[in-house]
Amino acid sequence: MRLESNKWTAWLLAIVIAIVLPARALADAPKEIRMGYPGVGVGNRPAAAGNAVATMHLRGMLEDEFKKDGIAIRWSFLRGAGPAVNELYANNLLDFSLLGDLPSIVGRASGLHTRLLAGQSVRGNIYVSVPADSPVRSVADLRGKRVAVAKGTATHLAAGKILEQFGLTEKDVRLINMENNVATAAIVTGDIDAAFGGSNWLGLRDQGVSRVIFRTTGGDPKFTSNSTFIGNEEFIKRYPEITQRVVKTVLLAARWLAEQESKPEPVYQLWTRTGFTYASYKEDWTNESMKYKTSPLIDPYLYARYEFQITEAKRLGLIRQTFDFKEWVEPRFLEAALRELQLEKLWLPRDESGQPKG
């Protein structure tokens, strides 16, 4: 009888565990994952391009990953770019985001509790555009001119260094804080004399309403921008398993980009959902390695790029104090995802100079 009683007790215990544990796990999962992106497409479209996070959004990969769990994915594409993303983190309204180097550095230096989870892009090209009928032929000609840049963004940091290269500082121009879509309209109407931005200026040039007077393609990478995938430290600590799945999905998007290395046309076509042109993406990425530039690895090159940018941001007065980059990095989720997906050999780690090891 006692043996039979013990069997019933074990059976009932098994039923309780089977019911209670999944319910407890479900109760501990978030109802939604709040994703942020520093920018919008043409006409404020909620879409972006150029990296794995943007590609993951366009392909609906994160939604597919969490659909079976009933966890919603809420994306915020912000006209205010990097500073607007930091504002959401400051108010605990965001869980993960792509973020350019300067705004993420500013956020960390000012005390935001974020962690860097994966690389996203290096050597992002910067362009300087002027109206088509402008007499300006060089960045050196911008002294005293009305120059637009989205302040607090990765482009802003690059702009400061590009101006220096031509003997100028921000004080030598009339620097106007202006997001991309507004700057595009202002170039067309002649309300500004020049603007710093990305490959979107190539499409405007092709329409015959602007000229590109400077571009970083093929030049010194110190004038280019970088971005990473970061997360809210509170969310990461509370939901490590969810964080692991998010990072794994980012990695899957990066793998898809790497697989298009030899024939990137499907990537450019996908990215046109932003409203920017296929031709502008193709030109911007000509002679560039998509696999190299969108590597998710947190390797010595990413360390070197960000340590340099932290120093430059301090030198140019964009942050008041620096911080230890190593303490910001949280590589365990990326490393676990690389092992799980057996992708340890897909991307070669790059040394401090940017050369692939091996």
Predicted regions and their residues:
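Pocket-lining segment of extracytoplasmic ligand-binding domains
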Residues: 176, 182-274
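Short, polar/charged alpha-helical segment
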Residues: 41-72, 109-110, 162, 305-308
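A ligand-binding cleft/hinge motif common to bilobed small-molecule-binding domains
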Residues: 98-110, 160, 165, 192-212, ...
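Short, well-ordered beta-strand elements
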Residues: 29-54, 71-77, 144-148, 174-176
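Conserved C-terminal helix/tail region of periplasmic/extracytoplasmic solute-binding proteins
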Residues: 311-358
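Flexible hinge/capping segments at coil-to-helix
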Residues: 131-146, 237-240
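Short helix-initiation/N-cap motifs at beta->coil->alpha
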Residues: 75-87, 100, 168, 173-188
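Secondary-structure end/capping motifs
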Residues: 43, 238-322
